[in-house]
Every structure is written in structure tokens, then in C-alpha cells.
Amino acid sequence: MPSSTYPRRRFDEVFLVEISSRILVTQEKHQQEEEEKKVRMAGKANVSVLMSEDASFHQKVAVEKRLKIGEVILRFAMIALALVAAVRVGTDTQTRTIFTIEKKAKYSDMKALVFLVVMNGIVASYSLLQGLRCVLSIYTQSPLTSKPLAWLIFALDQTMAYFSLAAAAAAAESAYLAERGQTEFQWMKVCIFYEKFCHQIGEGLVSTFLVSLSMATVSGMSAYHLFRLYGSKGKSIQ
């Protein structure tokens, strides 16, 4: 009896060891699968984050590119408008005979119109330089990253916007007096004698106000380019 019991006990021990080892292997395999699942989930999460960041980056690049193209268009449009205003006003003359006296009206007779012509010439030259800078920036794909340069461009754009508006306002006031006169000071209406002269001045004024509006828009773009350097902690968008 004892001799028959020993092999069975030995068999039971071997069987238990085999079962235990299989259970351990199964547990280790299950644990490994769980870890691999966690790694895959973390990888998917990282991919989602990277895709989201990439989409946000490309969206910013698209906005930046559209702004640059819009700025180029506006700056070259200002060149054309400023030149039109300067030429129309600067070449404006008309000669009339009033009571046997020949009178010649020209833009230099009114200081406000002289200021208008000079200011439009300055704006056209400045817009040409800035427009070429923008074209070069787009061609070389080199964004504006220098804060001092961004501040300089912003300040110059603001100055040009204010001065062009001041020139347009001063010329408009003079044109109004020429058109309506001033009875309190016994200033007569000049445009009833120099109709062509006044119409040409009006065309120059319209162009100058369009220049002022365009320059104000460009100033807003310059403000965006400047303050994004602080908002993104100096990181530029390629």
C-alpha cells in the first residue's frame, strides 16, 4: 500500500507544478498583452495630439500666407492710388479770363494741395520699398522674426496712415471752401469759375482717401505681425 501511494503522490505533485507553471505563463502573457495594449493606446493618443498640432500649425501657416499676399496687394495698390492722386493734383491747372483779367489756377496756390502732393509721393515711395520687402519675404519664405524691425515697420505704417489722412482732410477742407465759399469772410465760390480745376482736385482727393484707408488696413496687419511675436513667445511661422 505505501509503495502504490508514493507514485500517485509524485504524479499529483508533478501535475500541480505543471498546472501552476501554465497558470503563471498565462498570467504573464495576459499581463504582456495588457501592457502592449496600453502602449498602443498611448501611441494612438500621441498620434492624435501630433495630428491636431500639425493641423493647427498648417492653419496658422495658411493664415500667415494669406495675410502676406493681402499686404503685398494693398501696398502696390497704394502705390498706384498715391501716384494717381499726386499726378492729378500736381498737374491741375486752369486759366480763365475774369473781367478782362486772365487768372490761372494751379495746385501750388493752396498749401494744403501742396502738402497732399508731397505726402502722396512719400507714401508711394514708402509703399514701394515695403512692397518689395514683402515680395522678398514670400519668395525666400523668411518670416518677420525681428522685434525691433517689426516695431519700426508698425511705427512707420502708423505714421504714414496718420499723415495721409491729415493731408486728405486738409485738402478736403480747402476744396470745400473753394466749392461753397465762406460768406462770413466774404470768400466767394471759386469752383464756379474753375470747374475743371475743382473736378480734378476732387479726383485726387478720392484717391488720397483710398490711400488712407488702405494704409490703415496695412497698419492693422503690421500690428498683427508685431504682437504675434509676443503672443507666440517669439516663435515664428515658417
From Swiss-Prot:
UniProt topology in membrane: Multi-pass membrane protein
Location(s), subcellular: Cell membrane
Cytoplasmic side: 1-66, 133-148, 222-238
Keywords carried by this UniProt record: Cell membrane, Membrane, Transmembrane, Transmembrane helix
Pfam family, one: CASP_dom
Topological region Extracellular: 88-111, 170-200
Membrane-spanning intervals of the chain: 67-87, 112-132, 149-169, 201-221
Domain of life, per lineage: Eukaryota
A GO CC term assigned to this protein in UniProt: plasma membrane
InterPro entries per record: CASP/CASPL, CASP_dom
Subunit and partners: Homodimer and heterodimers.
Stated family: Belongs to the Casparian strip membrane proteins (CASP) family.
PANTHER family: CASP-LIKE PROTEIN 2B1, CASP-LIKE PROTEIN 4A4
Name this polypeptide is given: CASP-like protein 2BC2
Source species: Picea sitchensis (Sitka spruce)
